[in-house]
């Protein structure tokens, strides 16, 4: 039976502005089984708080879908703060680095799969699925990568080791079961996903826990006691009556299923070899035979192989072309789906399958993989649309697709509780725009505020950064070549004042919380296209809407339809907010937000020394982490548990900072 903790917000704030009405309408819609709703909420109107209050009001689990890891981390931090006593989980891609296997036919180049898995995110993914099995008060924040396949819920749910006090269990059987759940025996280096055996005592480090492990004491063939302990110091934490050990992999498969899968793989391999030989493709026939037989041999010996996900169709028993199992199959029926920044997230979901299919087709065509590899894929948009639960699309600029789902209806959240008004927008000639921008930036910086400049190309971003640097301005650029973690650090540095100006292309739009920003300059605003559509312009204008002194300058030599639409909508919102402020006697105030909230959760920097350590080690953070872990284990082996615990806490801080949560 699932735990039924009440979903309860811990906050001194009450809904204000348009929030009470938005919460009421969303709840009424969901109670009346309205499948699609749109929350049109402007920047700074408290859309996250509205989502949270809706979840609390309805007491239903929720999945919040974000377009990227940066925004997912930000949302996770906010939800974790709002719901401290509930299961707020984080489900994003666990790859720090991922190079998928691929074949480039024109140069006859095969690129092997290369990946680096982030252990912390892997733990959080396991924590997510465990919470879905055991609790009702679950809020999951996920990136769009959650539409990629994981192991089927029916297999995962069967592979759970349930142990209670006084249970009869054979020691050897217990060890075999742990191995079948993909736990590794390691009596010396005890980490997450391992177990160790000390006589009649078996210690397990569960896949979902970070700093706690379980000790099972056997007396003969009876469970004498179960305790929770600190794996680093060995200190006992709690006595437990019952534990459930979940598999150490979402791709877990029991032996009978694996045996059946291998038979099917062998049959399909024979068919594929014949096909290649009939087409005169002898190299491809030999290649597919060698590679697949090697994988089969590994599966027979160890129960898995490198790239086992390419055989997911056989392991799940699904027919060719059927939707892969994803996180959506783990969700309870009453789950609410919130699609944040839906105007960006929906197109991403729509495009993920096509890119993946092209690469897999090449691998299959040239004998590197069986055709079944094409079924290891993200959901097609139509599949996702069919299986998603009741949905609220959240955006300041919802696209036509979302509006069509609701037949043009939407819940509007224009009024900001802070009284902040949409920024004043001015249009200036694009001629000599750089000189004018520099002058505007200098004026803004004098007042202690930050500036955002959006341009059209990476080269322009880099060149303008170099030019402004030469003029003595503290400036940095940010575009898609900058990795996620570095982007988070750049934003934090901007807020701290290490930079005064940030130049970007398409990343200075959705969801960036920079209350210190008082100037947004849009270069070449009259160049019609995706980057200068009315939706893009409205989103970019919104970056200055968190500061009472915010202003936006659009540099254009002609008034395009997009500019006219964006300015008209911004002015409509300004007027509505001004009227509300007068009626309620509200003086607008800039949003005040703790700088650390953008990049970390529950992480307090104890000293400047730690920051300098991180900065010095940034170029080789993995090496530094290994050194710390080695030092921690050495301290523990020397029984210096207090020192070991201090190092462990430092490792946690760095991991959280690296994750951006």
Residue ranges and their predicted role:
Residues 32-38, 60-61, 137, 449-450:
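Pre-Walker A (Motif I) flank of P-loop NTPase domains
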Residues 38, 84-94, 307, 450-452, ...:
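Conserved RecA-like helicase motor-core motifs
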Residues 73-81, 101-103, 463-467:
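Short amphipathic alpha-helical segment within the helicase RecA-like ATPase core
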């Amino acid at each position: 039976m699932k735990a039924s903790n009440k979903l309860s917000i811990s906050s001194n704030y009450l809904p204000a502005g348009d929030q009470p009405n938005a919460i009421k309408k969303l709840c009424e819609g969901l109670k009346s089984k309205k499948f699609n709703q749109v929350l049109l909420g402007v920047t700074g109107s408290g859309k996250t708080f509205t989502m949270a209050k809706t979840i609390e009001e309805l007491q239903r689990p929720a999945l919040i879908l974000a377009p990227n890891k940066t925004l997912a981390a930000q949302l996770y931090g906010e939800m974790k703060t709002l719901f401290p006593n509930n299961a707020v989980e984080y489900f994003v891609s666990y790859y720090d680095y991922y190079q998928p296997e691929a074949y480039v036919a024109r140069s006859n180049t095969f690129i092997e799969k290369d990946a680096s898995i982030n252990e912390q995110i892997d733990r959080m993914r396991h924590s997510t699925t465990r919470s879905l099995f055991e609790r009702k008060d679950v809020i999951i924040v996920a990136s769009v990568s959650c539409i990629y396949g994981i192991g089927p819920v029916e297999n995962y749910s069967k592979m759970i080791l349930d142990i209670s006090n006084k249970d009869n269990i054979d020691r050897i059987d217990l060890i075999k079961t742990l191995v079948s759940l993909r736990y590794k025996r390691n009596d010396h280096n005890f980490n997450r996903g391992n177990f160790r055996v000390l006589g009649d005592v078996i210690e397990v480090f569960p896949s979902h826990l970070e700093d706690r492990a379980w000790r099972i004491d056997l007396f003969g063939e009876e469970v004498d006691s179960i305790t929770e302990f600190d794996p680093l110091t060995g200190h006992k934490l709690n006595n437990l009556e019952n534990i459930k050990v979940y598999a150490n992999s979402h791709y877990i498969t029991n032996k009978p299923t694996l045996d059946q899968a291998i038979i099917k793989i062998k049959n399909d391999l024979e068919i594929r070899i014949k096909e290649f030989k009939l087409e005169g493709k002898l190299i491809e026939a030999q290649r597919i035979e060698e590679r697949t037989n090697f994988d089969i041999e590994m599966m027979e010996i160890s129960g898995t192989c490198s790239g086992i996900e390419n055989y997911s169709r056989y392991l799940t028993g699904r027919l060719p072309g059927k939707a892969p199992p994803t996180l959506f199959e783990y969700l309870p029926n009453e789950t609410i789906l919130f699609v944040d920044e839906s105007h960006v997230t929906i197109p991403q979901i729509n495009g993920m399958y096509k890119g993946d299919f092209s690469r897999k087709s090449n691998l299959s065509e040239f004998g590197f993989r069986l055709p079944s590899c094409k079924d290891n894929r993200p959901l097609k948009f139509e599949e996702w649309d069919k299986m998603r639960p009741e949905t609220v699309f959240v955006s300041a600029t919802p696209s036509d697709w979302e509006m069509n789902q609701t037949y043009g209806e939407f819940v509007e959240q224009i009024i900001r509780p802070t009284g902040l008004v949409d920024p004043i927008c001015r249009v200036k000639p694009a001629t000599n725009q750089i000189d004018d921008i520099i002058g505007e930036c200098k004026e803004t910086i004098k007042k202690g505020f930050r500036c955002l400049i959006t341009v059209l190309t990476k080269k322009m971003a880099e060149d303008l950064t170099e030019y402004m640097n030469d003029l003595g301005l503290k400036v940095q650029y940010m575009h898609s070549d900058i990795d996620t973690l570095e982007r988070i650090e750049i934003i934090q540095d901007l807020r701290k004042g290490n930079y005064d100006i940030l130049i970007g292309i398409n990343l200075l739009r959705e969801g960036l919380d920079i209350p210190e920003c008082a100037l947004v300059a849009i270069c070449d605003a009259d160049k019609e296209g995706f980057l200068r559509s009315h939706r893009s312009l409205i989103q970019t204008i919104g970056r200055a809407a968190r500061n009472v002194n915010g202003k936006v300058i659009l540099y254009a030599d002609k008034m395009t339809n997009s500019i006219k639409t964006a300015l008209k909508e911004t002015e409509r919102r300004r007027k509505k907010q001004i009227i509300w402020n007068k009626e309620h006697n509200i003086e607008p105030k800039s949003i005040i937000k703790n700088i650390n909230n953008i990049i970390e959760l529950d992480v307090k920097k104890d000293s400047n020394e730690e920051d300098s350590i991180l900065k010095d080690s940034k170029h080789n953070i993995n090496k530094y982490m290994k050194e710390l872990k080695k030092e921690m284990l050495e301290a523990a082996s020397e029984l210096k548990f207090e020192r070991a615990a201090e190092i462990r806490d430092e490792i946690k801080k760095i991991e959280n900072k690296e994750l951006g949560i």
